[in-house]
Amino acid sequence: MSTPEPVLAGPGILLVLDGWGSADAADDNALSLARTPVLDELVAQHPSTLAEASGEAVGLLPGTVGNSEIGHMVIGAGRPLPYDSLLVQQAIDSGALRSHPRLDAVLNEVAATSGALHLIGLCSDGQIHAHVEHLSELLAAAATHQVERVFIHAITDGRDVADHTGEAYLTRVAELAAAAGTGQIATVIGRGYAMDKAGDLDLTERAVALVADGRGSPADSAHSAVHSSERGDEWVPASVLTEAGDARVADGDAVLWFNFRSDRIQQFADRLHEHLTASGRTVNMVSLAQYDTRTAIPALVKRADASGGLADELQEAGLRSVRIAETEKFEHVTYYINGRDATVRDGEEHVRITGEGKADYVAHPHMNLDRVTDAVVEAAGRVDVDLVIANLANIDVVGHTGNLAATVTACEATDAAVDQILQAARNSGRWVVAVGDHGNAERMTKQAPDGSVRPYGGHTTNPVPLVIVPNRTDTPAPTLPGTATLADVAPTILHLLGHKPGPAMTGRPLL
């Protein structure tokens, strides 16, 4: 007589707890400090394992922290995907970037016309959106082509790296320019303005006016610009370095965006292009990696193919899914988990939970979690829905503030939400797969370059919990492998839905 399956093939819920990493209890571990009886029991009482969510396991450079974009992409693809940062580094190492025909043409043209090259991007080594060392290759290429006027429009971080480190990173930018023999920092502005992605054009326009028209507070050095901020590196006000002279983007100049990730720079890129066009300035614009801008901006490095993932398999099988998240993570359960495809496929329903006004995550760590939870519970009760995919954003989004107390509250709110979702799953006979997409809240401090320990709101290289809650309790619970990666999630989901993994997937079902 055969042993009954511990999980019956049928409808389920994929629950991504953003920023849910695993680490030993510590004074800066918000997850261990928080009262989270549901999450604790989830891991202790149900089949669980730890999944690698950073570095080579997900298509990043070794030792690189995970992030929400690559996390959701790999969850959806069922295989590691070479991420843009890795592809850029490979292009640098092979010499392909330096010899790229488009880069060659842009630099030749601007050199021949005595125009200026404007390099715009985030200056840190957080490796989430950019890496300051990529400037070395771009500056060297400009020097080789004898481009005499190279202006760096520096965006300070304070989010993917420890706050109050902007001065050190701008010092590194100056060192790279000196080593290349060309380039100088012309403007400085915080990422809170230059990298808004929520459609707050009032913020973006400050960055546009700074770069295009030189409108900002005068500063005698990059360091003094950083010191002028009362809100840390993320909110350094628009600053024009007087020593750089006139560094406005002029007709015939070239602009090279060196962020490798699109989502937080594309709003700036689109608005700058529109502003320059409206003012009669023709500018040759190119990006280091591929952007999803309205404006067609040629890229030096193309992104990896992510087809053949979970979305394709669900559509081919005729299965219906509902995707639910609030605005901050909506693209992750739609665009990114679908392989950076914005198409709403047959059988997909997208539910975006929007907030009101500008978010203060420290003051409101619950965000819109109650409404997200209600939407998940409602979708779980529908008989026409095979798979609910939801992202609970609080642990990560509030964790990014670096505020330990607020992040503890966010963890506890998430715990209560998971309790409601698990109850809805039991009521509707659904299995649940709960997984983090990367670490964050389990480490809330970091040693700064000067040796001090400072609040840290960035991601980590820690593995993430992966838990399967079966849809039946009358059989022994299965045991999961001791190791896993995010690439195993999609094959496991398809197995639980009664389907085989797609041929493009290299991950394996964990049951």
Curated annotation (Swiss-Prot):
Mn(2+) 1 binds at residues 396, 400, 459. Its cofactor is Mn(2+). Mn(2+) 2 binds at residues 18, 68, 437-438. Pathway: Carbohydrate degradation; glycolysis; pyruvate from D-glyceraldehyde 3-phosphate: step 3/5. InterPro entries: Alkaline_phosphatase_core_sf, BPG-indep_PGM_N, Metalloenzyme, PGAM_B_sf, Pgm_bpd_ind. Binds 2 manganese ions per subunit. GO terms for cellular component: cytosol. Residues 442-464 are annotated as: Disordered. Pfam families: iPGM_N (PF06415), Metalloenzyme (PF01676). CDD domains: iPGM. GO terms for biological process: carbohydrate metabolic process; glucose catabolic process; glycolytic process. It is an enzyme of class 5 (isomerase). Keywords: Glycolysis, Isomerase, Manganese, Metal-binding. The keyword Manganese applies. The active site is at 68 (phosphoserine intermediate). One of its GO terms (molecular function) is manganese ion binding. Substrate binds at residues 129, 159-160, 191, 197, 261-264, 329. Its EC number is 5.4.2.12. The keyword Metal-binding applies. It catalyses: (2R)-2-phosphoglycerate = (2R)-3-phosphoglycerate. Catalyzes the interconversion of 2-phosphoglycerate and 3-phosphoglycerate. Belongs to the BPG-independent phosphoglycerate mutase family. Monomer. This is 2,3-bisphosphoglycerate-independent phosphoglycerate mutase. It comes from Streptomyces coelicolor (strain ATCC BAA-471 / A3(2) / M145).
